[in-house]
Amino acid sequence: MRFGLAAMAMLLALPAAAQQTSGSIEIESMLEGRKTITPDWQAINALPLGDKGNPVRVHMPPGQRAYLSRLVCTGGGTPNFSRIGSFGVGPYGTIVDAYNVACGANAARVFMDMYHPNYVERRPVPGFTIRDP
């Protein structure tokens, strides 16, 4: 039984390699706890990753910082980032935050949804590449 639980935990922690196009996901709301939802994947995936309507999914502030720390600028450098603030409810029904992410004079606004337990995004937002977690 322990092996089965350990194997399940490892599978749940695997990073996402491609955009999700169907099915339900688990979110963790500060007020409601964990719950399962079925997002409008067609509407979400019609927008670029990092848009307010397609925020980068992470788990809590450490997940936000971990994702942003893995981004790579065009020249190979590491971007600077700072939190701008919260921007209301996103497509998953939870609050999204925005970060300013800059490579020198080039800056982008990246929206993130931190209420996705056990989710690690492997895709970069437009304009960046990303290192493996």
Where do the language-model regions lie?
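N-terminal signal peptide c-region/cleavage motif recognized by signal peptidases
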Residues: 13-15
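N-terminal secretory-pathway/extracellular module detecting exported/lumenal segments
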Residues: 19-95, 103-133
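Bacterial N-terminal signal peptides that target proteins for export
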Residues: 1-6
